Amino acid sequence: MLLPNDPMDPIADGSGALTGPLAGAIVVTRDLATLQRAYADGLGLTVRGPFVSDARAVEMQRAMWGLPADLGYQLCVMERVRVPDAIKVLVIIPDRDTPRIRNTYAREETGPYALGFPMKAIEQVDERMIELGFRRTLPAINRYELQLRDGRPYPINEASYEVVDNTRLVALSRGGGLPQNGSVDPDSGVGGPAYSSLIVENVPEMEHFFTQVLDYERRTSREWSNFSPRFRYVTLHALGARTGNLGLVEYAPADRQPTSGVPPRPPNRGLAGWSFPVRSVDVVTKRARLHGAQIHAEPLRHEDPRFGRVIAATVMAPNGFLVEIFERVDA
């Protein structure tokens, strides 16, 4: 098969794709103000909520996301209204402290890592994030080159910032006339969230789950040596999609910082889940069972504050991360 020259371009035809691009992320935090300062004031997302849920909705939410019966909580949504395919962030605000999924901001620590934002130019966003009090993880914007498949280089400008609960926010701009790695607002030049990443200890195991259960495809697998320590970075996409990609990062055992041991899912704080639209929840849950994945919540109907009326289920990825699948139901 002749591969596209741009590694971000689709390989397989997406007309029969079982699963769409990453559509939602679940973030659990007690610090809504700081999260809002980062995502809304810094990156331009719109905040909706807190929402009032009736008893039946709360029952469904507790089952779907694993929220204990004795834990009170509120829900908000952060979204980029003018970019319909941007990831919608469900924010769960518990009424008491829950464990943090990550111990530190360290890149090498195993666990859910970041949401990523594509943009045409990074400098203005970088200045704003610094003014808002967020620490850039490097002394300056990181400027480096990647290669197209024919070997030609193209420039990348990237910066990551420490936000809440030991997670990061990544801003990235592709140069050389290439499209960004997700849709951007034509007026602001900023898009996303459009991708998300996990630091994992077994990339092949995680890749098998996302390709065999969710029908994703691998687009890139690189050894990144422009950072120290070096790491392997694999990108997975929905068939036919140019946004909503997953990044899996693996360090050599000697370079890893171990996981906190806190399960990477609600009600624990941090980046706690991903949400994917599917053609059939039943088909995907059957595939999950076939490949030995644990079903966290069986399919049920409920009103999701991001996606409306859905049939949804949740499945455990091999690392224990919460994966939500949903199909929209006509009103």
Language-model segments: what does each one mean?
Residues 60-61, 68-71, 75-79, 87-88, ...:
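Post-signal peptide N-terminal segment of secreted/secretory-pathway proteins
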Residues 1-18, 27, 50-51, 85-91, ...:
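Vicinal oxygen chelate
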Residues 16, 66-68, 103-107, 185-187, ...:
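Short consensus segments that form the blades of beta-propeller domains
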Residues 235, 240-266:
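Flexible internal linker/loop segments at domain or repeat junctions
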Residues 262, 270-273:
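Loop/turn-rich, solvent-exposed surfaces of beta-rich toroidal or solenoidal domains
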Residues 9-11, 57-62, 97-102, 146-148, ...:
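A short, acidic/glycine-rich surface segment
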Residues 28-84, 131, 142-154, 198-245, ...:
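Core segments of cupin and vicinal oxygen chelate
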Residues 32, 280-281:
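Long low-complexity, intrinsically disordered regions
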